């Protein structure tokens, strides 16, 4: 790969990441805010049925006082960003099983021409923050062993990816691709590795 092709690849990846963050930001923030109301309804039922003002005050107090609540809110936000990217911002496909294997490299052939694609790299990058935030949120339950963290982060990304692909298949939003599941899982393991590195660095400080 030449220097120009490398720069084009990095530029395309950066552009797609910024678009993926910018487009659904407000929607994801609102969805996460509403999702945490369901959490409060399930785990703080004493505050239910007292009007919307009381509900908002309870939400704010819980967000201010509970570290776990803030972690869950951030996890809901990251999850909704991914859901928007993979499901809500997609066109309908007549045949979701038209490309089951998917793309496994950064080059693809379209109408006999070789074209650069960043899909596999973006699938890896997409799951890194997700699995890292999952480990951060449930780290106390999972434990500190790096092997266990990598296993759990990879498993979380794999299950989440399978869920997304099945929804794409059932709703005809995009195509079901095995390569997506593989690269998402790799991204999940990398997210777990990043979490391990950050926790290790924090202990040294």
List the predicted regions and their residue ranges.
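Bulky hydrophobic segments
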Residues: 2-173, 178, 192-205
């Amino acid at each position: 790969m030449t220097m120009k092709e490398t720069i084009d690849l990095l530029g395309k990846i950066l552009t797609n990441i910024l678009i993926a963050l910018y487009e659904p930001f407000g929607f994801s923030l609102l969805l996460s805010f509403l999702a945490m109301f369901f959490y409060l309804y399930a785990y703080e039922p004493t505050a239910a049925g007292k009007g919307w003002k009381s509900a908002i005050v309870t939400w704010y107090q819980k967000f201010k006082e509970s570290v776990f609540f803030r972690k869950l809110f951030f996890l809901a936000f990251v999850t909704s960003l991914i859901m928007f990217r993979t499901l809500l911002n997609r066109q309908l496909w007549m045949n979701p099983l038209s490309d089951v294997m998917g793309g496994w490299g950064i080059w693809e052939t379209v109408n006999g021409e070789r074209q650069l694609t960043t899909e596999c790299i973006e699938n890896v990058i997409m799951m890194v923050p997700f699995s890292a935030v999952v480990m951060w949120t449930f780290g106390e339950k999972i434990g500190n062993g790096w092997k266990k963290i990598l296993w759990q982060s990879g498993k979380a990304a794999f299950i989440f990816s399978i869920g997304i692909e099945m929804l794409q298949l059932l709703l005809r939003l995009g195509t079901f691709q095995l390569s997506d599941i593989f690269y998402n899982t790799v991204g999940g393991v990398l997210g777990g590795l990043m979490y391990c590195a950050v926790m290790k660095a924090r202990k040294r400080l």
